[in-house]
Amino acid sequence: MRQFKEIPFYNQIVDKGTIKQLIGRLVAHFGSTYTSHILDKLKELGFEYGTKTGISLGIDDLLITPSKKWLIQDAEQQAQASDSHYNSGNLHAVEKLRQLIETWHTTSEYLKQEMNPNFRITDPFNPVHMMAFSGARGTTSQVHQLVGMRGLMSDPHGQIIDLPIQSNFREGLSLAEYIISCYGARKGVVDTAIRTSDSGYLTRRLVDVAQHIVVRKTDCKTHKCISIQPFLEEWKMNIHLYVQQKLIGRILADYVLKDNRCIASRNQDISFDLAIRLLSFKFQSIWVRSPLTCESTRWICQMCYGWSIGYRNLIEVGEAVGIIAAQSIGEPGTQLTLRTFHTGGVFTGDIAQQIRSPLNGIIQLNNSKIRSIRNRYGQPAFVCLDNIHIKVKGKDTYQSIIPTESLLFVKNNQKVQAKQVIAEIRSTIRQSKEEVNKNINSELAGEVFWSNKYYFKEQNLHDLQKNNFFVKNNHNFRNCPTSDSQNENDSNRSNHFLTINSIKYSQEKTNWPISNTGHIWILSGQVYKFHNIQSIFYKQQDKVRIKNILAQKELLVNNGGRYHNFHSQRLSYFQENLMNNSYTHSKKKTKSLSSNFVNNAICGLTILKEKKGKFSFLKNSSFCKKTRTNLQFILEVKNYSRIKHNDLLATLHNPAHRTSTAGMVKYGFLLINSQLDKNLKSYNKNSRKKKISLYQNNQIQPGQSLFWIPEEIHEIYKPFSFLHVKNGEIIQKGTYISEDIQCGTSGLVEINKRNRNHYEISIQPGSLYFLKDKQIALQKDQILIAPGEKIDNTNISDEWLYLKYLKTDQGVSVLFARPAKEYKIDLINHLEHASSLETLYMKKCFDVRISHYTPYEDGQKIRNNAGAQLISASLVFKLNNQNLAHKAEISWTRIKFQRKISYYLQINLRDKILPYSYSLSELKKLKFNSHFSNKNKQINNIDEVILGDTIFHTPLLTKNYGCIRTFSRRRQDNKTSFVLLSSSDQLELPLPIIFFAFISYKRFFNKKLGLIGNLYTKKTKLRNSNQNLFLNLFFISWYIIDEYSCNFLFWGAFSQLIKDARNKYSHNCFPIIIKKAFFSLGKFLSKIEMKILGNLETELGQVISLCNKKIILRIGKPYLATRGAIVHPRNGETIREGDTLMTLIYERLKAGDIIQGLPKIEQLLEARRENVVELIVNRYFLDCTNLLTEELGMLLGSLWGFQFSAWASMERSKLDLVFEIQQVYRSQGVYICDKHIEIIVRQMTSKIIILGDGMTDGFLPGELVEIPRARKTNRAMKSIMFYKPILVGITRASLNTRSFISEASFQETTRVLTKAAIKGRTDWLKGLKENVILGRLIPAGTGSEEIILQRLMNLQKIEKLRKGKSKKYTTSKLDSLLFSKCKSAFLKRHPLNPYCRETFHFILKQQITNSF
């Protein structure tokens, strides 16, 4: 009789886990029958005492932890500190979110940990406490939501909502908390109705893929195995019991040795006691057998499977473990959806392992092994470069070893308190991370400025240096891109404001990667952005009032016709008269007169002898993008020549508008003859007249298109008999037209006879469409059709086509569709220029426009195979008001800079204009008030208008009083922006008493200098080394930042900067030293500097004004940008509130599917492309290949290295897939045995895909074949079959089996049966499903006749070996009885034909003999 060990006596309070262990031990010792009797007694005992106790559950039983109040207050203080650091620019948005999550998650976890001691102390028999902490019903997390706090929630996508729910269900939720709570929750009714069907379908697919897996033999004799790493698994799941459950029931694959002592032997099953013993020895890895490594082809052996979960013993031969595995995985799929968080997706996680100081003392460590970094929460820390020893010296001495790559929060010789966190251990587990982009939106409207720490990455410099744009170099904005407005202003300023060979940038670039951590400032201001502005009435530094007109929009005529028109072409004026300004320009006296009238639009009627405007076509034209690709205008005028209205200045031949073949031109528009001035300048050269004529007649308007129908044309000067092609013949590319001419394209041949022995042969590419209706074909003859239009009743074009009607010799109507290429002219932006008017308003008297024209007529054929310039562009001189000036003079300057030659044009108006003054009454007579009238106003006057005329104007008004700070104009998209700086955007602070420096004042001038203030000489005496740094410097009392430029220079009467020769500070302004802090013009003040000024508010900003007693700041907000962040606006550009400022790129751990559990399982089991396992396989293959190439390349060779890498990566993918599936289930409290998942994964990874083009091996390319079958084929065939392993989903694996009956019963029945009939496939009925379909007994089960026969054979083998007889088989009574039983059992199951019956005796005897 079997002797059992003594069962230990349990005298403790048991919970759910202890009950499981107790039942397992009872089954192992007494069997299932006796165990069920014991459990019945235990159940009756529980019901009896439960009834006597009278346990009930009420709302009063929900006791709230007393420590909740101060824990939440502490968390709120930490959250406020994070907000303060974020507003000061010390943290960015991601670090702030991480700190918030860490703070509230830690608070929630501490509150959860306080629940159990609180219940034990106050009410140990509390029903909620007994129910939850025993595991009878509910979890600790759910009770925590009842009596603690709900904490952080996650939305349906798994993202954490940064607003924690501080209340619990006992206290009740507020409206906002309830909405957030419901956002992550799911409805139970919908979930039950929809998700349960998905779970059932998952079970069906799993059963189909694994139904034939049956335990057929005892041992497959394999030496392959997998390793279980106890400590790694423990870190993964953080549950020691999980490792025991993975070990219990497994079979050891090798001997386990400890100090040359055998702990366990090969093929020994791991019991509960052995598992505890193995874990106690702390082995790094334990090698066990697994279904993944079983050598059996279509089934599995007993040793590789291990224990039966139900009986705690080895699985019996004949068990259908495939169906058991499918049901064990599919059935909890219902639980995945039904027992998920109906109360919402509560964020749960583990607190990082931290090391705390056990006592008060001083830290001692080696500084050479640490390096300062910024941790993921934005806090300063130190990373350990190696394992370091740390000591805490106090009353006692505490020593510890900090592993490498851990984080230290203390430094050497620092005092620490008891329980203070001194280090954080980095996890050694390879955690799956994903890269996330976080868009940061601006919380302030204004201007964008980059700090001086930003530099481009080295790999971007080569691309950036190709462009012709300079950047100013000042002490606050270095080596960063500037806006277009700064480039415009720079062209009119002196050269010492520019830094040559500085970092350049491309105007097309909209994303700027940051290589160093720094700040991006947004300075406050009201932003006005306009599109398609024709008239702008203000410049920088102009002051405006409320509802002043900033600019105006004009509605232009797009087509000719009769429109409502205004009589007056003049602008309205201000109410006040401006002063007459006299100035000297080029030694000629000029006067200007401006007036102000009722509608607040600034305008000026100017009396002048000379007016200059400079143009830089290289830098400021709308063709700047094309100019950067080395496109250049060809000047058509002489230097210092006179020009008139509508004269051509230069032409441009764009290669993008040049064709590469011969062909035909078709207009995609109705030709509009330009209304040019009749008095065009006459030129001596004929080419000049020809270009003017072409410009007049064939001008192309913006938005119009030309079409090019390509063809190939050859001229043959030979008799017709020498031609190798016929008219109407379709030839291919490379066909010889004659003996020495070969065509370069495919198409239809058209032969035209010019003269005798002179033929023109045209090869026209295209397609032929036969039409029955001749009238329809004639209607579509010689027309263009757009993409998406019908060619005939059945065909739709996918590109521009040119249709041509043809008729065959048989009289059939054919449409010949030839491809047409579109050349479209984009909308034209007028060139900007700077003027020298000295009034507040600058009105354009002239303009230079770009006009496009074509030299070819509609339908004209170009016979040159080299192509032609289809469209040309011209610069045309326009006078906006011909009453002011009639003639002009043009000159150009040739400038060479850095091996590049640029031409700058200058146009001077030469005609003298008589002064004229309008009175208010005269302006009213001229109806100036109607100029800015509402666009909905009915206008009675009707006049004939043409293309380009203005119908009416729309004014754009200001909203507040202030000063224009920035004027930016971008030509690419015709956008104009202003920043209006008002009093609400500024902050005035008094300067405190100066303690650090002793300053004496001496009045130098008593005269007031307006905004500049008074002039003083200050003698500054400084202590220590700075004593003589600022002695006897020439200071200005009041400094104002130059609002016109981004360089922080002075403007006004005294702008000279005098510095001491020994001054080492590279500031462009005089600093004021207060309490060891420098306050200089243009400086961005930090929070510490604001506290020195006495400002306790949160506003930060930039110094724009300094005086003796006060400092004026422009309010701003800093944003921290870390390395790798992408900044969208350029430096100096405007941004509105809510616009995207930058994109932070950071890594985060991939969140488990808290809500979407079942779809995650389907994604893994179906091996979809977004599967994480596929990415892991590819990365592991590359890593393994590199390792083998470097270390074992000479030994193995590259071919064997790749083969080994493929095998290793596929083996690794199996384990990763098992872990990913297990992780989803365990995240929701469902435990599934690893062996069951391994059986399914084995079926998913047991196939290969055929490679190659031929069929020499009997398989088609792309066909799925089992791995053993492919290896047998390779051994049998002379030619090697190439294949690669593949990860197949369960649905695809079910449709690629050896049984076509099983495949047809699953999906695609017609296709599977048809394919099987064509191939003549044979189904050997080896699976369970096909036998059930045909009504046969299934070949599985411990009581099946085949299994009984196998057992008898094994018993006979054991008996023979025990008696020591020879292996030769001898007949005896036992043998005869065994033979007869096997024969009867086999013939009952398989009704064989006579041939099989005759050979059965020999086959059965041979099998029995071989088994011995």
Swiss-Prot record:
Belongs to the RNA polymerase beta' chain family. RpoC2 subfamily. PANTHER family: DNA-DIRECTED RNA POLYMERASE SUBUNIT BETA. GO terms for biological process: DNA-templated transcription. The lineage of its organism: Eukaryota, Viridiplantae, Streptophyta, Charophyceae, Charales. GO terms for cellular component: chloroplast; DNA-directed RNA polymerase complex; mitochondrion. DNA-dependent RNA polymerase catalyzes the transcription of DNA into RNA using the four ribonucleoside triphosphates as substrates. Keywords: Chloroplast, DNA-directed RNA polymerase, Metal-binding, Nucleotidyltransferase, Plastid, Transcription, Transferase, Zinc. In plastids the minimal PEP RNA polymerase catalytic core is composed of four subunits: alpha, beta, beta', and beta''. When a (nuclear-encoded) sigma factor is associated with the core the holoenzyme is formed, which can initiate transcription. This is DNA-directed RNA polymerase subunit beta''. It comes from Chara vulgaris. Binds 1 Zn(2+) ion per subunit. It catalyses: RNA(n) + a ribonucleoside 5'-triphosphate = RNA(n+1) + diphosphate. Transmembrane segments: none annotated. Its cofactor is Zn(2+).
